[in-house]
Amino acid sequence: MGCVRKNNEDMILVNDKFLRDDEIESTIIDDNNSTTTIVAIADGMGGHYAGEVASSDTLHSLQYFANDLPKGMTIAEFTEIMMKWFDNINLTIDTKGRINPEMSLMGTTLVGFIHYDGKFFWMNCGDSRLYRLRGGELTQVSTDHSLRNAYGNNEPSNIIINCIGGGCQTSYLDICEFRDPVKEGDIYMLCSDGLNDMISDKDIEVELVTHGTANALIEAAYT
């Protein structure tokens, strides 16, 4: 989630649901009838409505791909097939930006988690974030692919060095199994920089502990 702009380029995927502007409070119940559960955020960038197109194309591709995953893959096989998907969508977004002047340098970040065959994985490209709240303590799980994170605090925090499309020459996807088992009571939160640029990690922690809702975080970001 993130603060909504007039032209909102963020998009959310929750299994088979796509959301952009609506406020949402959702509970996902895993009834073990489905092999895969997926939640992701893409934060698009580019002129005109190019960012909206990039984030939408990426998440629709991811949803279609996740629904078609074969059962019983090993961790190595799952990681390999996810990387193949990433390479394909990166080429698609980059090509669309090259052949259409109005979509020049269109791109998007991507962050999400996938529950596949009893295992939890997280993925990240860019500076959208995955956090975990456990026992009242907030931890950033993902790593920002930003100039500041790569070269130090003297660099701007809002310049990313990795994205899907966007003319990026070395696009890559972090895809990892969770190191710690997911525990009862854990809260996992995805957000674009539209949230964490407006509110500190400590304030995010306080809001999650106190209220535990997306709407409370959005209100805190606006105040």
Question: Can you annotate each of these PLM segments?
Answer:
Residues M1-T223:
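PP2C/PPM-type serine/threonine phosphatase catalytic domain
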